[in-house]
Amino acid sequence: FVLRIEDIDRERAGSAQRQLEDLEAIGVDWDGEPLIQTARADAHEEALASLAARGLIFECYCTRRDIREAASAPHVPPGHYPGTCLTLSESERAAKRASLAALGREPALRLAAPSPEWTVFDELHGSYTGPVDHFVVRRADGVPAYNLAAVVDDAYQGVDQVVRGFDLLSQAPAQAQLAHLLGAPEPTYAHVPLALAPSGARLAKRDGAVTLADLRGLGWSTAD
């Protein structure tokens, strides 16, 4: 059992320690030292360089508002990037890059996905084919995007089966296609049902959900 601390989202400071405490509280142990995702920056950059060398990356100059407005077009799947910056000319790219630089900003990097869809195998749902858009692989702040970091680190750790919540099933085709492009094995998946409130929404504190830390505070032990 290997453990990875996915800490590239700096806004979730302190969550890693809480996760370790939760695992210890239910008696789960792991082999070796946890892999710290932010310590793998060199490997993530190597993956980006490999994609760039094959023309599989392009700069994106869009704001969230730009994407939201363009994504409302009827031919764009809900939540997907509409490809605004994919086919810009070099002169257009230079102008947009200069405009961002004047604002002290950098462009994000997106995958020029070769296939608009990909099929994965899920242990619970069988063969699943989903759309793959030109998703972000490096954010505008220079931090590798989660999808890229997770795929690179899964390959490094030898992860061949991914078990997670059903709400992430739609992400599997994009991650599997990226693994294929990086020459990494594509894992199989098992997307399990979520714990839902009576309304059908995800269970939250307001619905009476409790954390393992809450239970520890109430005196529950590992055996409980």
Residue ranges of model-derived segments:
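N-terminal Rossmann-like or analogous alpha/beta NTP/dinucleotide-binding catalytic cores
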Residues: F1-V76, A155, F166-A184, G217
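Active-site cores that bind ATP or allylic diphosphates and position pyrophosphate for catalysis
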Residues: R65-A204, T211-R216
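A conserved active-site cap/scaffold subdomain adjacent to cofactor or substrate pockets
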Residues: G219-S221
